[in-house]
Curated annotation (Swiss-Prot):
GO terms for cellular component: extracellular region. Keywords: Glycoprotein, Secreted, Signal. This is Uncharacterized protein F46C5.4. It is found in: Secreted. The keyword Secreted applies. Its main location: secreted. Residues 1-28 form the signal peptide. Glycans are attached at N58, N70, N156, N168. The keyword Signal applies. GO terms for biological process: regulation of synaptic transmission, cholinergic; sleep.
Length: 187
């Protein structure tokens, strides 16, 4: 009987420790943390190989420009790129950053050497100082509302922010939810 109480006591202690860890984790914000050239739009299938493969070596000039403009480095991931409106975004295996709950997730896109670049991260990890006068409050998949911000050789810089877990994705799914709700209401 005494052995049974010891096991129960040990289980309770372990469960309490796990619960405290979970509550501590709830006070954080999860954001996608990646960068990619956006030529994913020209690929037929989401799972098709990208050519040439994206990596730090063939994007050295881009990373140098980001460093010079106090924008932190993030992991290169082809799944970070925006996709066409007819393709469901897939962020499978995309790196995630855990940030303070008071932080924001951001999606930044811009043109560099004629290529569209998409960068996602926590705001505090991305920029040392927030010098963008225009942070949009949601992250749409496509937007004609472009900030006319120029940062070094980066042009048409657009930055959006949001404050819920993994909200800095391509928001096609939320658009589809709105269309579904509208369709149901019409019926």
């Amino acid at each position: 009987m005494r052995l049974h109480r010891t096991n129960n006591s040990r289980r309770c202690t372990i469960l309490l420790i796990l619960a405290l860890k979970i509550f501590d984790f709830v006070d954080t914000l999860a954001c996608y943390s990646c960068i990619a050239l956006n030529y994913r739009q020209n690929v037929l299938s989401r799972n098709d190989a990208l050519s040439p493969p994206q990596n730090r070596e063939n994007l050295t000039a881009l990373f140098d420009v980001l460093s010079k403009n106090n924008i932190s480095h993030v992991e290169v991931s082809s799944s970070c790129a925006d996709v066409t409106l007819t393709t469901q975004p897939s962020f499978l295996n995309t790196p995630i950053a855990i940030c303070d709950m008071n932080d924001k997730c951001v999606k930044m896109d811009f043109y560099y050497s004629g290529e569209k670049v998409v960068l996602r991260n926590c705001l505090s990890n991305l920029m040392e100082t927030v010098n963008s006068p225009k942070l949009k409050k949601y992250c749409p998949m496509y937007s004609d509302d472009r900030s006319e911000i120029k940062v070094g050789p980066m042009s048409n810089v657009s930055v959006c922010s949001c404050q819920s877990d993994l909200c800095n994705s391509s928001e096609k799914s939320s658009v589809m939810i709105y269309f579904s709700i509208a369709f149901i209401l019409v019926l």
